[in-house]
Amino acid sequence: MDWLADQGATVDQRIDLLANRLVLIAPRGSDIAPFTPGDGTSIATRLGAGERLSVGNTDHVPAGIYAKQALESLGEWPALQARLASGDNVRAAMALVERGEAPLGIVYQTDAEASDGVRQIGVFPDASHTPITYPMAVVTPSPSAATETLRQWLAGDAARRIFIRYGFTPLTGD
C-alpha cells in the first residue's frame, strides 16, 4: 500500500484490516516440546548437529524478513544465521518442515494452521518484529458502489468470522 502511495496513487480510507503472527513449527510427528521463543530457551539448542532452521529468504521474502527481525531481537541471529535453510517463499520454507528435511521452521500462523504436516511449537513475541498487517484502501478517485460494498463487507462481521477461521486476527469489525 505504501508503494502505491509513493507511486502517486490515491490511497483513501486506508485501514489495517488483518494481522498475522510469526510462529515456530515442527513436523506434525515431532517430539519437540512447545516453548515460547525469547523465554530463555534457545532455538539453536533445539537443532541437532547439522540440522537447519527453515525460513523464507531473509533478503526478500516477507516472512523471512520478519523471521530475521525476530531472531535479531531475541539475540538468536548470530547462532542461527549460518544454519538457515532458505525457501523462495513461506510455503516452500514450510514444505521443508512438512517433509522432515528441517526439524524447525518459522512461518506465518495462518500458513501453519493451513497445513496438516506441521504443528506450532511456539509463537514469537509481537514486539520481536515489525507488526504483520494487511491493509485495505480505496485506490481510485471515484470508487464505485461495488467497491464501497466490498470494503464494508471485508471490514464487517461475516468476513471477520472467515478471517478468524483461517488464523488471521481482524483489526476492525462491526
Residue ranges and their predicted role:
Residues 1-174:
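Exported/periplasmic ABC-transporter solute-binding proteins
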